[in-house]
Amino acid sequence: MPIMADQDHQNQTIIIGAGIVGSSLAYFLSKASPETNILVLDRSISDIVGSTGYAPGFVGQYNEKPSLTKLAVDSVKEYTKLNTGFSRVGGLELASTDAGTKTLQSRLDASKKAGLPARLLDETEIAKLELPIAGSNAGTAALFFPDDGVAEPKVLCSAYRSMASENGVRFQEASVSGIVMAGDAVTGVRLESGETISCSKLVLATGIWTASLLQKSSDIPSVPVVPVSHPYIYSKDRDHEVSPTPFMRWPESHVYARDHGARYGVGTYDHAPQHVSSPGHTATVPWRDELFNPAVTRAIANRFSADAGFTDHPPFGAEVIGGVFSVTPDNMPLLGPVAGVEGLWMAVAIWVTHAAGCAMLLEKMMLREAYDEDIAKDLDPGRFEGRSEEELEVTALKQYNDIYSTDC
């Protein structure tokens, strides 16, 4: 049944986006303030078609940026409470050069200072993990983070939706075509159906579609949220059971891999970044042979054992996905109130790693509770004000290749 723009809904909070960020925010808001009238809108409720639906689900907590470390730690604490969708299998960073090994030692020291357990593994300890890596990699250096793990983003998202619904949050499948303003204040949203829904607070948890939505609202400043395409491949299903293994990252090669249960997955950032200027209805793009095939070939060559299920030619296993996610000029989320626009809030460019932590922080900001002001300042959506859109886009795209170098 359509929701009309009547008096009953003028004081409600609308969240656009029902991925893990929007759904977890709806839960935390409804838990902290049961009287809050919350509506979550998404063009697809039954299917999760945003980045949440395609994210590999790596959850590494240590980051060279303290704010992201804290948000990741907070997120893991929340995910473990759900008893579903998160497995603490640990995370490995592997290096094969002296420089890479030195970097691992540096990250070990820094992670310990941050209060996160980590240790370097010797060759014998690596072998005991029974990783699906080629023999030539058996002697590589490895840094192990035992408290890291892997998430099933869609499972986590569904759990938060369910808990939010139990708290009275409403989820409606609808496509938002614009933001309605009165002066410098948000008063509602306009749907593609022509309806207008009133609200006093509006949260954009719109991920890769943020820029395109803001382009339709000339009264709202643009933000440097740049959608990019990313290759991820799945191996053939295994014909035998194996013990769960830690997720693996090779920072020197910009490659990562994880065990998905019946098969392995591999992704790589070792290619020129590709801006997706007009995202479609899902967070995917057609696979680009000329760009992705060479990168994936480099990623799997001499890296995995034969029983990992990969092949050295397309489709490299069983399935290839051209995923889409957002980058920003400093590889940090945009979270908080939008300056100069009363009632508008933003929660975008957020990975599963930090989603619950970001949602809890925004809930505190919106309800005027005590919150970490230093982290909020780091994530302020207006922190790039004064710089040109062209410069910010170029800077954001440059961040793509550094995602799994040292800032993991």
Where are these regions (language model features)?
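Flavin (FAD/FMN) cofactor-binding and adjacent substrate-gating region
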Residues: 81-83, 97-168, 172-173, 178-185
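Active-site lid/adjacent beta-loop-alpha segment flanking the redox-cofactor pocket in flavoenzymes
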Residues: 221-223, 237-343
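Central helical "cap/lid" subdomain
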Residues: 194-246
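Glycine-rich FAD pyrophosphate-binding loop
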Residues: 30-52
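C-terminal catalytic lobe of FAD-dependent flavoproteins
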Residues: 298-408
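Conserved beta-strand-loop-beta-strand element in the redox core of flavoprotein oxidoreductases
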Residues: 178-197, 202
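Dinucleotide-binding Rossmann-like beta1-alpha1 core, especially the glycine-rich loop
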Residues: 56-129, 254-257, 295
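Beta1/beta-strand and adjacent pyrophosphate-binding region of the FAD-binding site
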Residues: 6-21, 39
